């Protein structure tokens, strides 16, 4: 039986700590050494649409960036040397938003590592809807120890 996705949502949750309502990866389409393509299905049921914006629901740009960062975290934390660690955003540069994302859109999230030295790296990222680029940016990321969980 052929596997439909490179990683399901359940498998994603084994790698990154994000959970509802701040979990933005539905599945991973492709993953290689330095690049990932993941999918976020934007639905009207997202909490954010209660206030952003009534009558004109628009997925916030900052959450598109967070979605891209989560895809990047999966890519980074799947590397053997970083399993069990945390990936953090160190910076976001050259963010551009080309069109709005609305309920019903399917975002394809691409994150490609361009440089990695020690625990710090950079990446180019882009989000697409219907094959059109909606957002681009460059990330600086830092990998560090995971914080202790307290309940």
UniProtKB/Swiss-Prot annotation:
Subcellular location: Cytoplasm
Domain of life according to the entry: Bacteria
Keyword check for Disulfide bond: no
GO CC terms: cytoplasm; membrane
Keywords, comma-separated and alphabetical: Cytoplasm, Lipid A biosynthesis, Lipid biosynthesis, Lipid metabolism, Lyase
UniProt-listed GO biological process terms: fatty acid biosynthetic process; lipid A biosynthetic process
GO molecular function, one term: (3R)-hydroxyacyl-[acyl-carrier-protein] dehydratase activity
Chief place of localization: cytoplasm
EC number: 4.2.1.59
InterPro entries in the record: FabA_FabZ (IPR013114), FabZ (IPR010084), HotDog_dom_sf (IPR029069)
SUPFAM superfamilies, sorted: Thioesterase/thiol ester dehydrase-isomerase
Active site: 52
Keyword field contains Heme: no
Catalyses which reaction(s): a (3R)-hydroxyacyl-[ACP] = a (2E)-enoyl-[ACP] + H2O
One family name in Pfam for this protein: FabA
Record-stated family: Belongs to the thioester dehydratase family. FabZ subfamily.
HAMAP family, alphabetized: FabZ
Function: Involved in unsaturated fatty acids biosynthesis. Catalyzes the dehydration of short chain beta-hydroxyacyl-ACPs and long chain saturated and unsaturated beta-hydroxyacyl-ACPs.
Name of the protein described by the UniProt record: 3-hydroxyacyl-[acyl-carrier-protein] dehydratase FabZ
Annotated source species: Lactococcus lactis subsp. lactis (strain IL1403)
Name of the coding gene: fabZ1
């Amino acid at each position: 039986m052929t596997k439909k996705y490179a990683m399901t949502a359940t498998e994603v949750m084994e790698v990154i700590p994000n959970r509802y309502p701040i979990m933005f990866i539905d599945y991973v389409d492709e993953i290689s050494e330095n690049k990932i393509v993941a999918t976020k299905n934007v639905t009207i049921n997202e909490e954010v649409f209660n206030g952003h914006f009534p009558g004109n629901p628009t997925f916030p740009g900052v959450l598109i960036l967070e979605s891209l960062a989560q895809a990047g975290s999966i890519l980074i934390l799947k590397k053997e040397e970083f399993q069990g660690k945390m990936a953090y955003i160190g910076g976001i540069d050259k963010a551009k938003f080309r069109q709005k994302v609305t309920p019903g859109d399917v975002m394809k999230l691409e994150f490609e590592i361009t440089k990695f030295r020690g625990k710090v790296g950079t990446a180019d990222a882009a989000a697409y809807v219907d094959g059109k680029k909606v957002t681009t940016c460059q990330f600086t990321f830092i990998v560090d120890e995971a914080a202790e969980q307290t309940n």
